[in-house]
Amino acid sequence: MSNKIPTSAKVVVIGGGIAGCSVAYHLAKFGWKDVILLERDQLTSGTTWHAAGLIGQIGASATITKLRNYSLNLYKDLEKETGLATGLKQNGSLTIATTNDRLEELKRQATFAQRFNIEVNELEKNQIKDIYSLINTDDVVGGIFIPKDGQADPVGITNVLAKSAKMYGAQIFEHCSVNKILTKNGSIEGVDTKHGKIKCEYIVLASGMWSRQIANEINVSIPLYPNEHFYILSEPLKEISKSLPVLRDYNNCLYLKEDAGKILVGIFEPKAKPAFTDTYKVPNDFSFGELPEDFDHFEPHLKNAMKRIPALENVGIRKFFNGPEAFTPDTNYLLGETPEIKNFYVCCGFNSIGIQSAGGAGKVCLLYTSDAADD
């Protein structure tokens, strides 16, 4: 990367994770000129690099479901378009219920999915082992299987988006931190960076867990905070198949996926832990970073995982991971123009499901900014 950056641009995207690269890709592909993306360190170095990479199609609303489906189709098309690998495999997802209330919720999801032509199979208890042979179903009452869900490589997708964005004319500058966002009369004027100032008409802030503190410097409030997020990666299992579906066990706060012959066990625990003492002060140099292990916090969930997948009892832990993820109070994404500053847009707050959301979120940011440009 050259340190010589342009002095002006139409739009500056701040953040080189999967969300920022998706925004840059969509803007450039659909005709925006002078698109610049700035990344303080390397692409994916914030939280994208350690994401589990699950790709689910059903969201909590029609809008989120459409965004997720767009993401899935985009990632498939990008492989064909570029010949580069995104690591996408549609091995399906199995979600189980251990209570009748949960089963009723899953059945509602299956009905909801029909509106979007998403294939969902409702399963009786005795059908679940046919889908997931390693599972203990003693306490399971039923479930749903979504054949075209799957998983992908977050770094691979980001790199493909970045390369495609550059093919369409966007410029990407790594190791170029933003010192200050410049405003005038309540509107965006530009950015002051490590390598000089850039005048621009629009800014899209896609800086993940840094977004809150960056926006706070220009008195824009973004309700987002980083929590600790845990998973473990097992040693290889002989019994595991590469086509093993993603498994979700909401009653036990678990998700599991096959990972190169191993099993990744992640949790969304009821009482999460703040990742940093001051959520306005995420360290600027926190790149490819990990947080201290807290096995006592994770252990009860690991025990539940071993009950669910007994094969885990006889295999070691290759990696214990604790890293930050950005969450919002209502678990909704933060997308669109801020009320405080004109032409200042945000694309963040994906609540640890950024991989399956980023493709659609980038398209939404394109639509928002294009509408503004047409006014």
Pin down the residues of each PLM region.
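Dinucleotide-binding Rossmann-like beta1-alpha1 core, especially the glycine-rich loop
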Residues: G53-I131, N251-L256, A260-L264, G289
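Helix-loop-beta segment of a Rossmann-like dinucleotide-binding subdomain
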Residues: P6, T86-T95, Q109, K129-Y168, ...
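Conserved small/polar residues in nucleotide/adenosyl-binding loops
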Residues: Y368-D375
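Glycine-rich FAD pyrophosphate-binding loop
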Residues: K29-T47
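Central helical "cap/lid" subdomain
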Residues: C200-S243
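Core beta-strand elements of the Rossmann-like FAD/NAD(P) dinucleotide-binding domain
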Residues: T7-A9, K194-Y202
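Active-site lid/adjacent beta-loop-alpha segment flanking the redox-cofactor pocket in flavoenzymes
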Residues: V220-P223, P236-N343
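Helical element adjacent to the flavin cofactor pocket in flavoenzyme catalytic cores
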Residues: K148-I198
